[in-house]
């Protein structure tokens, strides 16, 4: 019986970590050199001219330090302009899971896309080693 318990303990210590954003149903990934940002919008379907929020996790890759904060913005590359509103980013509940110290959870409120077209989400991830931008494009119809 002890052997089975020891084997189970050893096997559980090699279990893979949950993927970045594993708790965010429907999340998509933005990526930089040292970070993944898994995010989803609330509501899930963004409407032109309506405020929305972004729930997200930052996940450090390899030996990169954990994020200490994030700024969220969006830009329309074809039009050369960004949003007319500035997002307010706050740590989310359970912002630093004890079992995953290189993951941090946030919520950004007050975003609005004022016209249809391609928008690039910008996640500027701050850490002890500097700031990196993770990007992801979405098309709003």
Model-predicted regions and their roles:
Residues 1-7:
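Sec-dependent signal peptide recognition
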Residues 8-17:
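Hydrophobic h-region of N-terminal signal peptides that target proteins for export
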Residues 18-141:
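Contiguous segments within soluble domain cores/interaction surfaces
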């Amino acid at each position: 019986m002890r052997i089975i318990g020891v084997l189970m303990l050893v096997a559980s210590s090699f279990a893979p970590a949950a993927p970045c954003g594993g708790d965010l149903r429907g999340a998509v990934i933005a990526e930089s050199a040292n970070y993944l940002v898994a995010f989803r919008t609330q509501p899930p379907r963004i409407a032109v001219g309506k405020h929305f929020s972004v729930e997200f996790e930052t996940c450090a890759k390899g030996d990169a330090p954990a994020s200490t904060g994030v700024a969220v913005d969006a830009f329309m590359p074809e039009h050369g302009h960004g949003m007319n509103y500035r997002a307010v980013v706050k740590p989310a509940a359970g912002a630093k899971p004890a079992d995953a110290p290189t993951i941090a959870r946030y919520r950004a409120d007050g975003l609005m896309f004022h016209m249809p077209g391609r928008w690039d989400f910008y996640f500027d991830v701050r850490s002890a080693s500097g700031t990196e931008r993770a990007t992801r494009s979405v098309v709003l119809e």
